Design a protein with these regions (language model features):
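N-terminal, positively charged, Ser/Thr/Ala/Gly-biased leader segments
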Residues: 1-22, 119, 136-148, 152-157
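Juxtamembrane transmembrane-helix boundary motif
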Residues: 92-94, 101-103, 107-147, 151-154, ...
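Membrane-interfacial helix-loop segments of redox and metal-homeostasis proteins
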Residues: 157-159, 181
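A glycine-rich beta-to-alpha transition motif near the start of alpha/beta enzyme domains, typified by
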Residues: 1-113, 164-278
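Selected transmembrane alpha-helices and immediately adjacent juxtamembrane segments
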Residues: 154, 162-165
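Glycine-rich beta-alpha junction loops
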Residues: 123-125, 159-163, 268
Length: 278
């Protein structure tokens, strides 16, 4: 099986071009290839498929084999692959995902290849029952939550997948590998949840760390950064346009009032290609 390793600011996935080959058991394959010691290494597996509704279709699987709805950095890299490898030569590219169609604007380098992308991440979902969160109020804004023997304030947003945003004074001091899985598996979240700890540097700048549902600690999370942009406005901590510093690099986010959509801009990198034994 031919594969390509790609990353968006360190959020890395193994990509399989299913225009040219088929994958029989993507869940098992995701677990095998994602292993950083015995596999290729990555946060999961992304299949690039034909689509009847858009230019291409994306299916993503987390490192534990569970299927996810959407990955912001993953869809940006998929758009780069599709354009650079001739699967779709339109700009913008429309990608069908389990969370809906995403439109990606491409920024090309001097050789005509994709260097960076801007994704229309769509409208955030703010209603608790649709995120979903087991919470009696309509929205989950600064809700008290205990984890790791600490009390936090949590704001929840869905960008096609559920996110919990928690603001702290010093993000580096958070015991992420302890409290991340505890919050992810909290009964409040029937589908589990992605967890983000955020430190506000200014109204237009934050730094954040992520525990991804099904993958653990990751260097970046595009849907998570989008949720952080929305949560900042809901809590009054940031404006509608921010730069998010993640361990793997920076993303620029904007939640536009004009159409209620979130836009995310960042680089997309093809690392290497190879053959995985069948």
């Amino acid at each position: 099986m031919r594969f390509t390793k790609m990353h968006g600011i360190g959020n890395d996935y193994v990509y399989v071009d299913c225009f040219r080959q088929q994958v029989e058991d993507p869940s098992a394959l995701a677990k095998a290839v994602s292993d950083r010691h015995f596999g290729i290494g990555g946060d999961g597996l992304i299949l690039i498929l034909p689509s009847q509704a858009a230019d291409v279709r994306m299916r993503m699987f987390n490192a534990d084999g569970s299927e996810g709805q959407m990955c912001g950095n993953g869809v940006r890299c998929l758009a780069k692959y599709a354009y650079d490898h001739g699967l779709a030569r339109t700009n913008p590219i429309r990608v069908e995902t389990a969370a809906g169609i995403r439109v990606i604007d491409l920024q090309l380098d001097g050789s005509g290849r994709v260097a960076a992308t801007t994704v229309d991440m769509g409208e955030p979902i703010l209603e608790a029952e649709r995120i979903p969160v087991n919470y009696p109020q309509k929205r989950v804004i600064d809700m008290p939550l205990r984890a790791g023997q600490r009390a936090f304030g949590m704001t929840c947003v869905s960008m096609g997948n559920p996110h919990a945003v928690i603001y702290v004074d010093h993000v580096a001091a958070v015991a992420l590998e302890q409290v991340g899985p505890e919050i992810e598996a909290n009964p409040l979240f029937p589908q589990r949840i992605n967890v983000h700890f955020v430190q506000v540097l200014s109204p237009s700048e934050v730094t954040m760390r992520t525990w991804e549902r099904g993958s653990g600690v990751t260097l970046a999370c595009g849907t998570g950064a989008s949720a952080v942009c929305v949560a900042g406005v809901l809590t009054g901590k940031t404006g509608r346009s921010i730069t998010a510093h993640l361990p793997g690099g920076d993303l620029k986010l904007q939640w536009r009032e004009s159409n209620n959509h979130v836009y995310m801009t960042g680089p997309a990198v093809e690392v290497f290609s190879g053959d995985w034994p069948d």
